[in-house]
């Protein structure tokens, strides 16, 4: 995977506000690669500590890593059965946010 792509993924992930979440697919789409959500997931799997990987979840609102539940709950999110409650309300759309 290209280092440039990883850096772009990390830059977008760092913009996700505290208490909000986005998806692998939304980041991929925002970067112009709408079919590369798995590549975003792979990049996030090895991200630096300053990247809030816990705020990037699957398109159905499911946590990809169960260990992220505690970090999201600390930000005020409610997690039930590894799923973010009120996912649609808490969803941060990078395309909308970056174009405003």
Locations of regions flagged by a protein language model:
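Nucleic acid-binding interface residues in structured DNA/RNA-binding domains
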Residues: 1-100
